[in-house]
């Protein structure tokens, strides 16, 4: 069937901010969709609140709205743009739920907008638990015994019938949010209560526990002629009980018989037909009992999912692209396979290699969080590897995770019998360390049966782990490392670093092993991903390495640039860095062959048709050097870009240069100059720039001396970190001692000598009550171009990645902006930057302080680019390749005059707000972890509010980050520290004028009473040990109080807004319980007075309900017009 001709314009809804369970994979799928629609001549209207996405680039759609994905805003855009159809299946659960809400509100009918990709009925049958159970039954398959509940009373009744353990699964949520496994009534109430809250339909499915069963997934696609293909089967190494996003997964499947696999196919095809997905794809999850073979259907997603992105990258079959074509009316047999260009999409992909995905976690960012892996997803990113066998693929994937333990470790002494027993007990509870525990137990003598009984991991995988250990022991014990043994080690997935450790070769061991390997002529070869197990020739150069005989690399003629990506998403290094890499690829591809190296299956950069060559490889020194050596033989290489992918590639710069690899842009020496505190301090002194007083320390004594010289409070952090890892504000000697002792315990044991750390701690004076500013800039060696000046809405002390900020700045004077510009130019020259740089400043009492400079792309580059209409990363890539800023003005990449530091009258305002994952992380007794923000970054994503002035833009940013946005009336709870009480009366008067009733603790209420402001008194909470069930919360009744504390009032739904500024040690104060309860109830809460002043302005804007919706294409034209007028006015003034 040919494409439908009645669809002229389509609205695509994105997935919004990066959150756990819904990450960069939807930027990948959304970008694919937009490209397909435009290629087909369809006008594209895109809505997404996340500026750090390629899909929100102006060239991806005809009209791009970086606005909240809420029904009122979406209706405004639909009314303005009048699309023929809405495509919601490529924006995750957010887009699907938004489409359902638009349908229920009558908006789709009112404006005659057709839903394509999936009907409302199909969405309901796939997402609603009860409806889906019926579909499964009609398909002749089995679900786990279960029942639906909407209240805790109904939950208890089901528990009485089924007994424990029970699985709770909410309807219409993603990433298993609100789900969990309950082993008793208390756990059941906690999990089910959260599930009912997070489900938009207040519905949970309670099902019998099937922990320990084997788990599989199928990715399927179906067209309107009822053709169905199974794109990829995926096997979870972890058994049922661990969310598939937190499990190691592999393709193809290894532990199914052909008969079992065919049974899963038959069930999957019957279900996709029964649900009614007839123009797109879906993901179905199954469980199989390891002994009886009983098959249970767990759930399905009637949309492109996280697993779809993994399956696409694993097979080379672009699911999102094909789903979009199916939504336009094509059938599978009419769509060409891009990789072979000779087979249709109705040919099911076949793979002759092994794909392994390993999750990346960030528990270290959330002290007190329960590290147990359950049915609610907790990983923040993932890495994928391809190789010739499972062992090699697993080894590559584990070192791609980029953590301190790069895969399995056999360091130290062989575990004793007692330690093995302890390890077997520990691995019964799944955590991120389970596989390291398994390998250590095997090394210590555990049997396969013991490992299986403790983990329920399939015996086939356990046997693979035993084989890896056996190879490691051969390497460890051999007198000499023969070529044959070294090759065997490589086929077992062991890196040069691991082999060096096994051989006890010390610091230079990796280089020693590499030299030996190269002397033996042992190099990996590079194979092509072709979708068909080499049955047809692949036209797309999409490569992976393995230790085999024949390489499939082809010669090239053009000079090449290698761009190193950022690896798996993690807090502090996320999608923003992939955005800059993709821009570099797009721009440099005009003049060079672009070679992308990355290992993240979620990203746009690992789309096989984004770069000229794609290497799906770990970002380690060994793997990158092998790619460089292989590519050098295929054609000329201009150099490698390490500046755009964050700290991971940046940390390789010096070693790559030492190995003879040319580095483009800022040199490794200049990178070290900016990162080294003493050297950078000298640059600042020469340029007469202020910095907070600082010192460095390798021991507790040195740290104490530095802190006393500087004066408390101080900011303490390790050197060379991203995302404020390990950063803390310290107020006294006791807190400092705790910090240093923790740093010593976390350092590798063999690097700590006599209580001294291997690398110094940095200790800075903490600037209280200062305004913090981020500046992104380009420098070509002569000229500076300011990309954007972003003023933080919170005062200094909150990590820049977590802080809300505004562009243009809202309170800085022209003189302050001039001083920022001059300081940035001086630092760029002093650090010899070439390309992008980011400098963080603070104004305290109008004195400018330099906090730090980063000679690389920062996480604010996408936001600054969208707010100013300038593709900063594209211009930076050309500057790194040797061009000038003047050339970028001439070719249209940069503004022809002026830059992002100029503030124009009438300019639209952009506000960036962070999105935090706290509702995912709970303590072992079920409380959410503390949300109090500080110098260590904890956000996973961001949103952008964009409107005519700051109040409206900030209000949009809150609407995009809080479900429902800011309240316009109701009850506001206030509890502020003594320092903030002087500002409080003005805030309180405004709240009363806006129609709020104030509820406050006794101390705050008495301050308000002195100013004639009435408030309801709420009991205070005293929590001795928040996470200890032996010490429950005690309540102290205040005179004249309502008789309840604020936590009870929040749980009863009586509080609509919270202002809670903690004291200097906030995280252990009463505030913790308040903040934890507010997260669970999804109530907007603010912990600084400066941000709350912005909230008051925003509430006024919300009450007016006169938001503007402006596409970024319109905004860009407006900015250029403002710049032109400004230039003309300047020329006229000079002429006079």
Curated annotation (Swiss-Prot):
Identify the InterPro entries for this entry. Answer: ATP-grasp (IPR011761), CarbamoylP_synth_lsu (IPR006275), CarbamoylP_synth_lsu_oligo (IPR005480), CarbamoylP_synth_lsu_oligo_sf (IPR036897), CbamoylP_synth_lsu-like_ATP-bd (IPR005479), CbamoylP_synth_lsu_CPSase_dom (IPR005483), MGS-like_dom (IPR011607), MGS-like_dom_sf (IPR036914)
Locate the residues binding Mg(2+) 2.
299, 301
Q: Provide the residue positions that the database annotates as binding ATP 2.
A: 717, 765, 767, 772, 797-800, 840, 852
What remark does the entry make about the cofactor?
A: Binds 4 Mg(2+) or Mn(2+) ions per subunit.
Binding annotation for Mg(2+) 4: 852, 854
Segments forming a coiled coil? none
What's the protein here called? Carbamoyl phosphate synthase large chain
Enzyme Commission code: 6.3.4.16, 6.3.5.5
Q: Where does Mn(2+) 3 bind?
A: 840, 852
Query: Where does the record place the region Carboxyphosphate synthetic domain?
Result: 1-402
**Catalytic activity annotation:** hydrogencarbonate + L-glutamine + 2 ATP + H2O = carbamoyl phosphate + L-glutamate + 2 ADP + phosphate + 2 H(+)
Subunit comment: Composed of two chains; the small (or glutamine) chain promotes the hydrolysis of glutamine to ammonia, which is used by the large (or ammonia) chain to synthesize carbamoyl phosphate. Tetramer of heterodimers (alpha,beta)4.
């Amino acid at each position: 069937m040919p494409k439908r001709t009645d669809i002229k314009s389509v609205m695509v809804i994105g997935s919004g901010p990066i959150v756990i369970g819904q990450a960069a994979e939807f930027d990948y799928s959304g970008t694919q969709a937009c490209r397909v629609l435009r290629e087909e001549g369809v006008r594209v209207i895109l809505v997404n609140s996340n500026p750090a996405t390629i899909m929100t680039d102006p060239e991806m759609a005809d009209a791009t709205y970086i606005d909240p994905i809420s029904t009122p805003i979406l209706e405004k855009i639909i009314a303005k743009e009048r699309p023929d159809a809405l495509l919601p299946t490529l924006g995750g659960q957010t887009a699907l739920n938004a489409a359902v809400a638009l349908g229920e509100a009558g908006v789709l009918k009112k404006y005659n907008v057709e839903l394509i990709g999936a009907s409302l009925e199909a969405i309901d049958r796939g997402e609603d638990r009860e409806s889906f159970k019926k579909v499964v039954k009609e398909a002749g398959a089995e679900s786990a015994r279960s029942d639906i509940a909407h209240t805790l009373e109904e939950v208890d009744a089901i528990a009485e019938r089924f007994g424990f353990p029970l699985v709770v699964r909410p309807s219409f949520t993603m990433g298993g949010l609100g789900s969990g496994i309950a082993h008793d009534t208390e756990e059941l109430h906690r999990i089910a209560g959260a599930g009912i809250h997070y489900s938009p339909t207040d519905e949970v499915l309670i099902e019998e526990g099937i922990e320990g069963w084997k788990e599989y997934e199928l990715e399927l696609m179906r067209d309107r002629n009822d053709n169905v293909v199974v794109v990829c089967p995926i096997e979870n190494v972890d058994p049922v009980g661990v969310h598939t996003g937190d499990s190691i997964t592999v393709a193809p499947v290894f532990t199914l018989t052909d008969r079992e696999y065919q049974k899963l196919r038959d069930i999957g095809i019957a279900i996709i037909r029964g649900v009614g997905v007839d123009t797109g794809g879906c993901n179905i999850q199954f469980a199989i009992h390891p002994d009886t073979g009983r098959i249970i259907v767990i759930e399905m997603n009637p949309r492109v999912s996280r697993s779809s992105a993994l399956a696409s990258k694993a097979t080379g079959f672009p699911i999102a692209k094909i789903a979009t074509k199916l939504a336009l009316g094509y059938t599978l047999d009419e769509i060409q396979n891009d990789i072979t260009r000779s087979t249709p999409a109705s040919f099911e992909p076949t793979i002759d290699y092994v794909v392994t995905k390993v999750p990346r976690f960030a528990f270290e960012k959330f002290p007190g969080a329960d590290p147990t892996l359950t049915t609610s997803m907790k990983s923040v990113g993932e890495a994928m590897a391809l190789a010739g066998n499972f062992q090699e693929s697993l080894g590559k994937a584990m070192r791609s995770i980029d953590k301190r333990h790069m895969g399995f470790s056999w360091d130290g002494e062989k575990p004793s019998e007692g330690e093995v027993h302890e390890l077997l007990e520990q691995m019964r509870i799944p955590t991120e360390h389970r596989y390291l525990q398994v390998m250590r137990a095997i090394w210590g003598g555990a049997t396969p049966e013991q490992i299986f009984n403790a983990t329920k991991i399939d015996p086939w995988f356990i046997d693979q782990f035993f084989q890896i250990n056996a190879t490691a022991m051969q390497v460890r014990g051999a007198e000499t490392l023969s070529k044959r043994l070294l090759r065997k080690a490589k086929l077992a997935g062991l890196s040069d670093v691991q082999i060096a450790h096994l051989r006890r070769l010390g610091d230079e061991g990796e280089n020693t092993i590499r030299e030996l390997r190269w002397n033996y002529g042992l190099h990996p070869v590079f194979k092509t991903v072709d979708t068909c197990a080499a049955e047809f020739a692949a036209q797309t150069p999409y490569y992976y390495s393995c230790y085999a005989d024949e390489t499939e690399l082809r010669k090239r003629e053009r000079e090449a640039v290698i761009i190193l990506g950022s690896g798996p998403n993690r807090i502090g290094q996320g999608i923003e860095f992939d955005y800059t890499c993709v821009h570099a690829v797009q721009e440099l591809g005009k003049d060079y062959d672009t070679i992308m190296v990355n290992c993240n299956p979620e990203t746009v950069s690992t789309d096989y048709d984004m770069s000229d060559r794609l290497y799906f490889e770990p970002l380690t020194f060994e793997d990158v050097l092998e790619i460089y050596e292989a590519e050098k033989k295929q054609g000329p290489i201009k150099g490698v870009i390490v500046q755009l992918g964050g700290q991971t590639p940046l940390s390789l710069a010096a070693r790559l240069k030492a190995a003879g690899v040319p580095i483009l842009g800022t040199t490794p020496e200049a990178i070290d100059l900016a990162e080294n505190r003493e050297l950078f301090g000298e640059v600042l002194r020469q340029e007469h720039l202020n910095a907070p007083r600082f010192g460095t320390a390798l021991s507790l004594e040195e740290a104490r001396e530095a802190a006393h010289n500087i004066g408390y409070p101080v900011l303490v952090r390790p050197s060379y970190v991203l995302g404020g890892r390990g950063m803390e504000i310290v107020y006294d000697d006791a807190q400092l001692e705790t910090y240093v002792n923790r740093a010593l315990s976390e350092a590798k044991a063999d690097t700590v000598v006599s209580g001294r750390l291997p690398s110094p701690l940095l200790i800075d004076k903490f600037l209280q009550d200062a305004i913090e500013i981020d500046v992104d800039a380009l420098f070509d060696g002569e000229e500076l171009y300011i990309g954007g000046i972003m003023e933080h809405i919170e005062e200094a002390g909150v990590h820049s990645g977590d802080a809300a900020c505004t562009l243009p700045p809202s309170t800085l004077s022209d003189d302050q902006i001039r001083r920022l510009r001059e300081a940035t130019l001086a630092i760029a020259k002093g650090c010899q930057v070439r390309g992008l740089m980011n400098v963080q400043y603070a104004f305290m009492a109008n004195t400018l302080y330099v906090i730090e400079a980063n000679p690389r792309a920062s996480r604010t580059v996408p936001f600054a680019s969208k707010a100013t209409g300038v593709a900063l990363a594209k211009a930076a890539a050309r500057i790194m390749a040797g061009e000038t800023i003047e050339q970028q003005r001439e070719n249209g990449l940069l503004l022809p005059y002026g830059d992002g530091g100029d503030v124009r009258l009438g300019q639209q305002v952009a506000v960036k707000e962070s999105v935090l994952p706290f509702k995912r992380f709970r303590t072992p007794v079920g409380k959410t972890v503390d949300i109090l923000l500080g110098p260590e970054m904890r956000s996973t994503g961001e949103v952008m509010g964009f409107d005519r002035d700051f109040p409206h833009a900030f209000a949009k940013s809150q609407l995009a980050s809080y479900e429902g946005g800011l309240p316009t009336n109701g009850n506001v709870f206030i509890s502020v520290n003594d320092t903030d009480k002087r500002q409080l009366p003005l805030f309180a008067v405004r709240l009363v004028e806006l129609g709020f009733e104030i509820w406050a603790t006794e101390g705050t209420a008495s301050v308000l009473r002195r100013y004639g402001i009435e408030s309801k008194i709420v009991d205070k909470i005293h929590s001795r040990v928040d996470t200890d069930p032996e010490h429950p919360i005690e309540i102290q009744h205040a005179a004249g109080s309502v008789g309840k504390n604020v936590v009870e009032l929040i749980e009863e739904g009586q509080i609509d807004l919270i202002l809670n500024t903690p004291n200097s040690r906030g995280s252990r104060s009463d505030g913790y319980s308040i903040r934890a309860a507010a997260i669970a109830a999804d109530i907007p809460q603010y912990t600084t007075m400066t941000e709350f002043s912005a909230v008051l302005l925003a509430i006024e804007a919300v009450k007016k309900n006169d938001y503007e919706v402006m596409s970024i294409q319109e905004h860009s034209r407006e900015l250029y017009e403002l710049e032109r007028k400004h230039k003309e006015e300047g020329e006229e003034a000079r002429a006079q």
